[in-house]
C-alpha cells in the first residue's frame, strides 16, 4: 500500500508542476511534467486532459485528440474530455 501511495503522490506532484507551467505558458515544460506524471500513473485523468489542452494550445490537435480519447476510454462518464473532443 505504501508503494502505491508514493506512486500516486509522484504523479500528482508532476501534474501540479505541469499545471503551474501551463499557467505561465511554459508549454514545453508543462508537456514534460505532464508526461512524467503519466509515467507514474497512466490513469491520471486530470494530467491526461491537461496534456491534451497543452497540445491543443500549441496547435498539435492530433496529439490533443489522442490524449482526450485515451482519457475518455479510461473514464467514460463525467469526463471533460468528451466536451473537448466534441468542440475540436
Q: Whereabouts are the PLM-identified features?
A:
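TPR-adjacent "capping" and linker segments in tetratricopeptide-repeat scaffold/adaptor proteins
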Residues: 1-13
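Conserved structural position within tetratricopeptide repeats
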Residues: 5, 35-39, 70-73
